[in-house]
Amino acid sequence: MLRPWLRQCPRATRSLACPQCHLPRPQTARRALRPLPALSLSHPIRSLQTTTTESPDRIPLRKQLKQDAKAVKARKRQTRENEEASREKWELTVGIEIHAQLNTESKLFSRASTSSTDLPNSNVALFDLAFPGSQPEFQIATLLPALRAALALNCEIQPVSKFDRKHYFYQDQPAGYQITQYYEPFAKNGYVDLFRHDGIAPEDGDTVRIGIKQVQMEQDTAKSQEYPPSTQLLDFNRVSHPLVEIITMPQIHTPATAAACVRKIQSILQSCNAVTTGMELGGLRADVNVSIRQRGDTAGTHQYGGIGGLGQRTEIKNLSSFKAVEDAIIAEKNRQIAVLESGGVVEGETRGWTIGSTETRKLRGKEGEVDYRYMPDPDLPPLYIGADLVAALRTNLPTSSDALIELLAGPEYGLPIEDAKPLVELEDGARLEYYQEVVDLLRALQSDQDPKAQKGLARVAGNWVLXELGGLWAKAEEAWDAARVPAPTLAALIDQLQRKHITGPTAKQVLAMVFAGDERPIPQLLEEENLLLRPLSREEYVTLAEAAISLNPAMVEQIRQKNQLGKLGWFVGQMMRMGEKGRVEAPRADAILRELILDQR
């Protein structure tokens, strides 16, 4: 049955049309159809696009990637040029304040524990919460790690020091003031030396000495945790935890050197057992003071740490990583330069930094001495430090990292700085002790060998301790344990390698077996596993070399005619593949190849 709208059309001109869009669909007719009325442009017409013509502005992917890479390189080059121009015109000055938690069992002015693993608000004394009538009791034991830190930083210990109150109101400080040593700290006039291997900026040369203005003891504040929109939780376990505040002189002029300074000071504090943790676990925080002035301009009105002619400084608080120190200084330097170049004035203020940001943000106006209302603490007597105590602590200080690196890089060990530095820093010196034991044992085992060969044993041992054994530890993702591969075992393995009883690949295989738990002595393990090297005769080497040469005559001609000696390594590899595993020695294979290829030109 025809639909009503179709019945109204004559048969000859009937067409199927969509009732929604009313577009006719012509059917076959026996007589000519009348012309259809023009279609309204208001109705969409669908058509199939079959052309493959590309848009004229379309760029092939590979070309686009190249253009993007060039643009990035150009931006970096422009940034470097701008920074270079900025360095020539403007001088950056940075001073650092480092707050480090001391390694003590009790708090600074109470007997409450400093444990960081207990439940929140479980280690709190009445004085920590500023209960009325509670009095501070200075804990003598907290002074010892503070003194070790100051001595390691080459400071002068003051025979008499005093405590002061620094007044401010904030929720993490129940008393309304912090006890510190502003006027008479216990240590002054120290320094820290930074070297190129510490990561200082190239423009700072090979070494930089940064002065330490003072080191003072003070209280830590409560730990706060924010729950938006309006809730904050406070853990008072941290209140009155002993801190040392280390204040450097404003003698740093590059962001990289500032980060290197914080890193070096943390390393020094850890090496003398003055602190429990570093920046990575929140045990050390840094504030940086940043100022800008035109290079060569000494007419500035601001003075910090006895150095005058500086620009107005801003302070960036609570930086918790070395990268944050460097990035925050760069951002603040650029901000101050932009302000000055636009004719503005840099305001003295406290600013904050968020990891991953490119700009610092204002927190509050900068407080001065008057704002904090420093005053002597009437409840604490002066602190007297005896010269005998200082002398005893100085005698028992561990060797500094700089001295250890100098020793390892010197004639006794001959290590490159790149190996000496991690040996000193890894596992708080445990890796260094292990390495020195391996070297001593190896030298004893090799005492019957050529003195010239013995001279390089320390470097060989360094490579095995850092690279080969270190690689196994990194792959296992486990904490260092010297008993896993005892020093005598590693020394015996290297001895077998030096005597050419085994090849390098075999030595690595055996080390992996020992690391996995094989406790057999090295000689027994090599014998039972049939891993001892059975040297090939000259005739066997020649046979292997001739077989390898026959594989690629064209490369042989390149070596002979163009002296491309680097391609000999390919033939050495072929000989090692064709020969019995572990028996082909690369140096001997190379020598035979040179005879057959070069001497027969």
UniProtKB/Swiss-Prot annotation:
GO terms in the biological process aspect are: glutaminyl-tRNAGln biosynthesis via transamidation; mitochondrial translation
Functional summary from the UniProt entry: Allows the formation of correctly charged Gln-tRNA(Gln) through the transamidation of misacylated Glu-tRNA(Gln) in the mitochondria. The reaction takes place in the presence of glutamine and ATP through an activated gamma-phospho-Glu-tRNA(Gln).
Tell me a GO cellular component.
Answer: mitochondrion
Query: Which NCBIfam families does the UniProt entry name for this protein?
Result: gatB (TIGR00133), PRK05477.1-2 (NF004012)
Q: Name one GO molecular function term.
A: ATP binding
**Lineage of producing organism:** Eukaryota, Fungi, Dikarya, Ascomycota, Pezizomycotina
Spell out the family assignment given in the record's similarity comment. Answer: Belongs to the GatB/GatE family. GatB subfamily.
Put simply, this protein is called Glutamyl-tRNA(Gln) amidotransferase subunit B, mitochondrial
Q: Does the keyword Ligase apply?
A: yes
TM spans (from-to):
none
Alphabetical list of Gene3D superfamilies matching this protein: 1.10.10.410
Point out the transit peptide region: 1-55
